[in-house]
Regions:
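Accessory terminal helices/loops
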Residues: 1-4, 102, 116-118, 123, ...
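Conserved beta-strand hairpin/beta-sheet module of binuclear metal-dependent hydrolase folds
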Residues: 2-57, 174-184, 190
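Short Pro/Gly-enriched beta-strand edge/turn motifs at strand-loop
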Residues: 7-14, 130-135, 155-157
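A short catalytic or substrate-binding loop motif that flags glycine-/basic-rich loops and adjacent residues
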Residues: 19-21, 144-146, 165-168
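Alpha-helix C-terminal capping segments
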Residues: 29, 78-83, 213-216
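Metallo-beta-lactamase
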Residues: 41-44, 133-136, 158-233
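Active-site HxH/HxHxD metal-binding segment of metal-dependent hydrolases
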Residues: 45, 54-152
Length: 233
C-alpha cells in the first residue's frame, strides 16, 4: 500500500511478520535519483511489498539509493536487494558488519547477557533467533557514511543529517528545513517506545538519547515521520 504524504514523498508500509512491531514505514523520495529511507527485514514478505511499491511508483532500482536511519534489521535488512548505494552512519555500519562477519560478536553478547542475570539457555536462544541474525542485510555495494549536519539532495527535498545517538550508537534523523519535515527513524515514535538498550560503544545510551531529544526539540517541525506506526502533524 502506497500513501502519498507530500509531492514527491510516499510511504510504503512494510509488514514485519511474527514481530510485535507489526510494520515498518519505508519512505520514498522520488527524483532523478530516488531515495528509500529504511527497508524492512531481509525476508520475502518484506521484499515483495517494497518491490511492489517501488514498481507502482515507476522507479528503476538502478536509480534508487537506500538510507538506513540505523543498523537494526527491520530498517537495513533489504538494502542489498534493492540498491547498490547505502547511506548509513559509520558507527552503525561497523556494528552491522561486525555482527555478520565476526562469530565472536554473538558469543561476547551471550556472555554479557549471562553476566547480567540472563539464564544461559535463554541467552543462547536469543543469539540464534535475533532479527540481526535471521534477517541481516546481504549488502555488497558501496557504503556511503553519513556525517552530522551534511545536506542530501533528493527530488525536491533538501535533507539535513542529524546525529541522534541513543536508540543505536549511530542513529540519524533527517530534516528538511523548508518543508519542516522530520524523518525521525526510531528516535521519536508516537505509539510505542523507542526502546533504549545497552551498547558496548556507548557509556550511557539513555543519557545520549535524552541529549538527542533536546537536539531535535529546537527544530521547527510541521510533520514528523517515524519508523513505525502513525505519523503526526
Amino acid at each position: 500500500m502506497i500513501e502519498k504524504i507530500e509531492n514527491g514523498l510516499y510511504r510504503i508500509q512494510i509488514p514485519l511478520p511474527r514481530n510485535p512491531l507489526k510494520s515498518l514505514n519505508s519512505y520514498v523520495i522520488v527524483g532523478k535519483r530516488s531515495l528509500v529511507i529504511d527497508t524492512g527485514f531481509n525476508m520475502e514478505e518484506c521484499y515483495s511489498q517494497l518491490r511492489k511499491g517501488l514498481e507502482e511508483l515507476g522507479l528503476e532500482l538502478k536509480k534508487v539509493d537506500v538510507l538506513a536511519t540505523h543498523l537494526h534489521a527491520d530498517h537495513l535488512g533489504l538494502a542489498g536487494k534493492i540498491a547498490k548505494n547505502l547511506l548509513i552512519s559509520k558507527v552503525d555500519a561497523e556494528i552491522a558488519i561486525r555482527s555478520v562477519i565476526e562469530p565472536d560478536y554473538w558469543k561476547e553478547l551471550v556472555e554479557f547477557y549471562i553476566r547480567n542475570g540472563f539464564p544461559e539457555k535463554e541467552a543462547k536462544k536469543v543469539a540464534k533467533i535475533h532479527p540481526a541474525v535471521k534477517y541481516a542485510s546481504e549488502f555488497s555495494g558501496e557504503i556511503v557514511f553519513l556525517n552530522d549536519r551534511e545536506i542530501l539532495e533528493y527530488g525536491n527535498f533538501s535533507l539535513k543529517v542529524i546525529s541522534t545517538p541513543g536508540h543505536t550508537p549511530g542513529h540519524v534523523c533527517l530534516y528538511d528545513a523548508d518543508k519542516k519535515i522530520l524523518f525521525s527513524g526510531d528516535h521519536i515514535l508516537f505509539d510505542i517506545t523507542p526502546n533504549i538498550t545497552f551498547w558496548e560503544t556507548m557509556r550511557d545510551s539513555l543519557g545520549e538519547y535524552l541529549l538527542s531529544l533536546e537536539k531535535v526539540y529546537e527544530l521547527e517541525v510541521r510533520k514528523t515521520l517515524p519508523g513505525h506506526r502513525n505519523f503526526y502533524n
